[in-house]
Amino acid sequence: MVQFNLPSNSKIKKGQYYKDKTGSKNIRKVNVYRWDPSKNENPRIDTYEVDMDNCSSKVLDILNKIKNEIDPSIAYRRSCAHGVCGSCAMNMNGKNGLACTKSHSELDGDIDIYPLPHLKVLKDLIGDLSTLYKQYESVEPWLKTTKINDKENIQTKEAVSYTHLTLPTMMS
């Protein structure tokens, strides 16, 4: 199993159990790592019974369903929901991946969701990305102009068409 960066002197304990209230026969248990540093408590694993008949196919859909219908206090990152930005990266059943691209049907048994193991946990499934942002800034991944203009910089048709040629490669 993966080693997680837990708060010092902590032990993960059993948390709350949220029983399904829909009466559905198609239920999956989803175990989610929860920790709130403001509460001065140990991390816990909360278990949610989720009605899979009314849930879309991805793990991110399960988390959204939990947040919208069962427990609005759960904290996790999400953004594009198309596997591009990486915001929803987390550990699912022992493997790191994107919750927006991972189909819950690919995961056997109960679904265990943890934050990424190599990041300091800020809250629940949210890892500290400050080191990533510093590295990102150090490579300066933005366009730079050679001249300072007081007016808007208008792109030429050639520059726009070049951008459209490279975008599919970047998104692949």
Pin down the residues of each PLM region:
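Iron-sulfur (Fe-S) cluster-binding modules
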Residues: 1-73, 105-160
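Local cysteine-cluster metal-coordination motifs and their immediate loop/turn environment
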Residues: 75-105, 165
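Conserved small/polar residues in nucleotide/adenosyl-binding loops
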Residues: 163-169
